[in-house]
Amino acid sequence: RSIDDIAKIHRITIWYQRGAKMDKHTEKSVHGGDVYRNQVELDFSVNINPFGMPDGVKKALGDAIFLCTQYPDEKVSKLSEAMAKKLDVPQECILFGNGASELFVAIIHARKPKTVLVLAPSFSGYEHSAACEDCQVCYYYLKKEDNFELTEHFVQELIRQIKAHEAPDLIFLANPNNPTGVCISFDIISQIVFLCCEHRITLVIDECFIEFTKRQNESLIKTAIHSQYLIVVRAFTKIYGIPGVRLGYLAASEKMVECLKRQLPEWNVSLLAQYAGAAALQEDEFVQKTSEYVEKQREYLTEKLRLLGLTVWQGEADYLLFYSEKNLYEMLLKKKMLIRDCSNYKGLESGYYRIAVKKQEENDRLIAALEEVLSDENIK
């Protein structure tokens, strides 16, 4: 197919920023989970599995404690073998890191792009990694009228940039996106993959939350191992509830993996992480149970929030983005509940909040607290 076969060309504006320096959107705490500076009983600001860590992973971590006098396996052999079997891909096409964030940085160091394209709003870690090579970061702004979905418009703009020799060297996309929870349609993402591979644009797909959705069969891992320009990144953090362990992985061609491996320090995956990861891969039933439960609770929370008069965006992950004119962050913090203030996300503003989908009783406590603070505000 030629470029013109894909779509007609329409121009839109993309805002460019030299480098990825911190501005008003990133100078605040750029992640949720700020429990170290706040007295919190319920933390809805981090998108972790509502069931927490699987028992099998807890046991593996307990057993591994007694082995920590040893160095970890530098080749991550057992975990790599188990992952290759689970994904049905060659072991040489998988690379583990100290969380997905380390892998994003390694990708930037290896590819050395001059220009990097990210969506707005999206995970700030992409900008952070781009700053390691002082790349020019450009943003494609998603529209709330489109439910923050990536539409055909993006494909058309990418085509225009390719024809004008203005295309970025590297693109970060998240599927589903964070903080919106919105997934990219398979048709759109397929067109983007085709364009990037055809025109030598490195495409990094962040699938860290895909296991919470019903779109696991749309993963691009199997595609990535046959491409020189596609990389898929995932993490154990969210689905297995182990952010403190730090374990992420990517799938790419063998040649790409070898290139990326050279950017990582030796022993970057701890012994604890390797044992936890191997145990986690045995938890298929746990993942399935989580996905089903999260879907029901997400729908439940969406309905309850809308009944309170809040604007909620329809996502597919284990979190929800909503809007209120009230300062809900401070109001709920007084009740020892922490939600994610999304005003420091580029493309969002004051009034946008993200909450994790948790267990029924915790979700009910949040709704009750919101009813109370909103009722008090209305009385005033």
Task: Tell what function each PLM region has.
Residues L305-K336:
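Conserved PLP-binding catalytic core of the aspartate aminotransferase-like
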Residues P72, A84-A106:
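Short loop-beta-helix segment that forms the pyridoxal 5′-phosphate
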Residues R1-K21:
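Short, Lys/Arg-enriched N-terminal segments with co-localized hydrophobic residues
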Residues A110-A131:
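Conserved PLP-anchoring active-site segment centered on the Schiff-base-forming lysine
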Residues M53-P54, Y229-V312:
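PLP-dependent aminotransferase class I/II
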